């Protein structure tokens, strides 16, 4: 419809001699391609609220996260893990995780949460498993699904960069610093898998 209007408008000079007499410059019709995204664009704003949260049949909130890792440069294949600070100061270091929502796959949720909280992305690997844990207030049980993520890109600015710190640490430091017992178990599962493949 718009292109038809532009086409008709640009042909008005042929229909009315007064346009020539007025010495007007009428732009010629241009076809401007509309960019089509080939991949999803990641928002720089974290999702908030629980309206889209996924729960299992027992009422357990479904949470998903990652063990972001990389191979240390000049480290002979040594692995480093990325930990993030808790939102509240003094609550220690954690792995990135958050709610799995009903409009996304478990893999999409894992990548989204890791970008939002840690500002990294990369190659998601096979799930490490599922751990049950109690919420902060100990009133609700959550299922925590964790995936290894081989980091290929680290962003300088990310959705939660204003109130989270991040730190690359050795595997032993990660076990020592990680505050949540279920996350330490996920780290141990990750270490066991990597030991078997090396």
From Swiss-Prot:
InterPro entries: DDP-like_NUDIX (IPR047198), NUDIX_hydrolase-like_dom_sf (IPR015797), NUDIX_hydrolase_CS (IPR020084), NUDIX_hydrolase_dom (IPR000086). A motif (Nudix box) lies at residues 98-119. Its cofactor is Mg(2+); Mn(2+). Expressed in roots, leaves, stems and inflorescences. Residues 1-37 form a transit peptide. Mg(2+) binds at residues 113, 117. This is Nudix hydrolase 21, chloroplastic. It comes from Arabidopsis thaliana. The lineage of its organism: Eukaryota, Viridiplantae, Streptophyta, Embryophyta, Tracheophyta. The gene is NUDT21.
């Amino acid at each position: 419809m718009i292109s038809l209007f532009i086409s008709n408008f640009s042909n008005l000079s042929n229909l009315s001699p007064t346009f020539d007499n007025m010495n007007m410059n009428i732009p010629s019709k241009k076809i401007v391609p509309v960019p089509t995204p080939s991949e999803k664009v990641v928002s720089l704003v974290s999702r908030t609220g629980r309206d889209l949260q996924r729960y299992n049949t027992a009422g357990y909130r479904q949470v998903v996260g990652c063990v972001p890792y990389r191979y240390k440069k000049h480290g002979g294949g040594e692995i480093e893990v990325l930990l993030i600070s808790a939102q509240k100061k003094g609550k220690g270091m954690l792995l990135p995780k958050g709610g799995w929502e009903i409009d996304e796959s478990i893999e999409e949720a894992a990548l989204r949460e890791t970008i939002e909280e840690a500002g990294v992305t990369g190659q998601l690997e096979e799930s490490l498993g599922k751990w049950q844990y109690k919420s902060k207030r100990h009133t609700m049980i959550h299922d925590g699904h964790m995936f290894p993520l081989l980091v290929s890109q680290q962003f300088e600015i990310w959705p939660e960069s204003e109130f989270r710190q991040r730190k690359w640490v050795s595997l032993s430091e990660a076990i020592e610093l990680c505050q949540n017992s279920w996350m330490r178990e996920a780290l141990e599962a990750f270490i066991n898998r990597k030991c078997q493949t090396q």
